[in-house]
């Protein structure tokens, strides 16, 4: 019996990356990836003069298999909401949509990854415009350079060459203090810290430097709540009680 194969034109990448609703949503997806990799922190550095966004974590990095998974559209090996434990730290999985590399493409055309795992350093980069011009991207090969390195080197660094429009939009969003603080408060966990730095403007935000939620707008605060997904319990507090 004759068979046919599914093919996907490169314009699909452009369309999917544009459907990511906002630059803040895209950054949140990248923050989730660092959290799920058990990094103690993530640093987002925005360099307007260079049109570069750098996202750095100290997580467990990516193996060859995990790099392959990164480019599997809408497919994730993670189970959202499930507890995972690594080196005595337990976290609840945040990412599951398979949006890792599409989120990076929200900001620009060229993205470079550098990741360390088990004494190996892997470097690879992708140019979105090269993919978009392909008639069929299902068989596109992405070169990955892997070298031995010290096992003390860990984590992943993503370098994005941002286009002017997306950089301008991102800076406009983060110019509002409340929005910048909301970004670094995307995940509240004592074992994880989110750093945001905007070069040229000497702007720096960090989860560790935020006020506690219960201390925000105390005079106007009606109540606040705490929820435990483990106990499946909601606690309401008024005036600290």
Q: Model segments located where?
A:
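GHKL (Bergerat-fold) ATPase N-terminal catalytic module, capturing the glycine-rich phosphate-binding loop
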Residues: 1-162, 167
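Generic hydrophobic, helix-prone segments enriched in Leu/Val/Ile
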Residues: 16, 170-171, 187, 222-225, ...
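Generic alpha-helical secondary structure signal
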Residues: 65-68, 174-177, 211
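Short polybasic amphipathic segments
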Residues: 110-113, 125, 191-201, 223
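ATP-binding catalytic core of ATPases
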Residues: 137-203
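GHKL/Bergerat-fold ATPase module in large chromosome/replication-associated machines
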Residues: 195-241
């Amino acid at each position: 019996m004759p068979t046919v194969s599914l093919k996907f034109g490169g314009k699909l990448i452009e369309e999917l990356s544009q459907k990511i609703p906002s630059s803040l949503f895209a950054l949140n997806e990248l923050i989730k990836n660092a959290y799920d990799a058990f990094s103690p922190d993530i640093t987002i550095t925005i360099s307007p003069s260079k049109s570069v966004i750098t996202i750095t974590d100290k997580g467990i990095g990516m193996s060859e298999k995990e790099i392959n998974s990164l480019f599997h559209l809408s497919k994730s090996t993670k189970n959202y909401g499930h507890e995972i434990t690594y080196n005595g730290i337990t976290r609840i999985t945040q990412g599951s949509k398979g949006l890792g590399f599409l989120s990076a493409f929200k900001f620009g055309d060229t993205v470079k990854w550098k990741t360390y795992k088990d004494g190996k350093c892997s470097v690879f980069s992708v140019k979105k415009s090269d993919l978009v011009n392909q008639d069929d991207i299902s068989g596109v090969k992405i070169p990955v350079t892997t070298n031995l390195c010290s096992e003390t080197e860990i984590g992943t660094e993503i370098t994005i060459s941002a286009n002017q429009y997306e950089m301008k939009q991102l800076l406009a969003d983060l110019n509002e203090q409340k929005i910048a603080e909301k970004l670094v408060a995307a995940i509240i966990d004592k074992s994880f810290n989110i750093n945001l730095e905007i070069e040229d403007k000497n702007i720096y935000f960090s989860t560790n430097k935020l006020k506690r939620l219960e201390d925000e707008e105390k005079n106007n605060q009606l109540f606040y709540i705490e929820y435990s997904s483990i106990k499946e319990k909601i606690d309401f507090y008024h005036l600290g009680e």
